[in-house]
């Protein structure tokens, strides 16, 4: 699952054989922000390992869910991109905006295409 937030961009998966989630990021500080603000139980960040996402940490399903609930309860903004720009800077907002624009290609697709 991809998650774009005002504290970072994450890819969350459960790897085969694991009972916990792996939270992956392209920027190490995104995991630091997530850990500091919403998920103190998130493991230390592991760097590298020759994978698509250079930074990763692990957490239980339950603690991840609790952290996401906290993050959702903190939503007070009326414009996501403006809040991203305010909290994370204009460069991050531009990357998020490009992703949003690219996802517009989904409009008009039918189920299964």
Language-model-detected regions and their locations in the chain:
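Structured alpha/beta or helical-core interaction and ligand-binding surfaces enriched in interleaved
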Residues: 1-113
